[in-house]
Amino acid sequence: MQTQHREGGAPAPDTRSGADDMIRVLPRRTVLEQPAGCGDDPCPPPSRPQEFRDWFEREGYVLVRGAIPPRLCQAGIDAFRAEVLGDRLGFFERHVSGKFERHQYTPGGYMKYPIMNLQDLASRRHAGFRRAGLTVLTHPAIQRALTVLTGEAARCVHTMYFDGNQVTWAHRDGHYIDSRNDGEMIGVWVAAEDIHPDAGRFFILPRSHRMRVPGEEGDPNSAQYKARMADFVRDGPLDCVAPVLRQGDLLMWKSMVIHGSLPTTDERWSRRSFTAHYVPLSHPYKWNVRSAQSARSLRFNRVEVMLHAVDGTRVARLRNHVRSEWPRAYGAARALWQGLRPGA
């Protein structure tokens, strides 16, 4: 279900500095829709559990067609468009910066930078989107597939929603967040709509979880890391696979598999999708780019979902409440504070 018209009115200019320049790194020229030598949809289904697990362990990813009912995917899109896309005052936690920022829009009018941690959306204005997104990401089909892969139930530690395409750099999730048992976290990506080839498809390097990239140690947010990963994708020995993904399709991958997104070549197209990361219930999780992890969680659809909002003090709780419910006042106060800081 694609839309070609612009949404959200005239797009606000993207005022982010040149940070994007260093992440717009292209994968190799030959991008495959399935692994070389395979026919269409080579991945075994979860109903063949041993083959499903063997493929996942060997290739590092697996694709489940039609896992999520289209009506639930569409409900998530509709709630986003009704409650979030046009909210020009609201502050949302962003993937690239890790900060709470207002929307930036693509030339096609889509939200450029994805929202992180839907479970932490506190405003009543966004309650429908929060509920619809978590309904998709905790769906029983996902839980069944996770149980087949891990042998136990799993805990959701992180969520995201994409509307437009920020062009995510090639990376390993495990360099940012993972299970305490390194490499045991599983990523989940649900296509909320049919993803057009020109929208910037998700790409993955099968079997990359078994290979090291020279110089990949260090800060995974640095320009050097992103350049080394880009070089490996472009010039390394592994295929770059960007599967055709349709509404309701589910892609799952190991935390040390290299993946990212292709650049958008036609700004008319969105790439609406929901993402989550899961660890087995018997495993603690860890942040590799944050000083501490939250111990708080909620239960949704019988699934434990970790909360990450920093609200350990009265001041933090007050700040979060003002940011959620009175974003105009919060924005004015933040601008004033930043103007008063030394060196501003």
Q: Which positions does each model-derived feature cover?
A:
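Short, conserved beta-strand element in jelly-roll/cupin
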Residues: 180-197, 252, 277-281
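Extracellular structured ligand-interaction cores
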Residues: 61, 183-189, 199, 240-242, ...
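Short, structured patches in soluble enzyme cores that scaffold and shape functional sites
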Residues: 160-161, 172-174, 190-194, 206
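Cytochrome P450 catalytic domain signature, combining two hallmark sequence patches
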Residues: 81-94, 212, 220-221, 294-297
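Short edge-strand/loop segments of extracellular domains
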Residues: 164, 205-212, 271, 277-283
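Non-heme Fe(II)-dependent double-stranded beta-helix
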Residues: 14-58, 65-171, 176-178
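Double-stranded beta-helix
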Residues: 195-260
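Non-heme Fe(II)/2-oxoglutarate
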Residues: 5, 9, 16-41, 106, ...
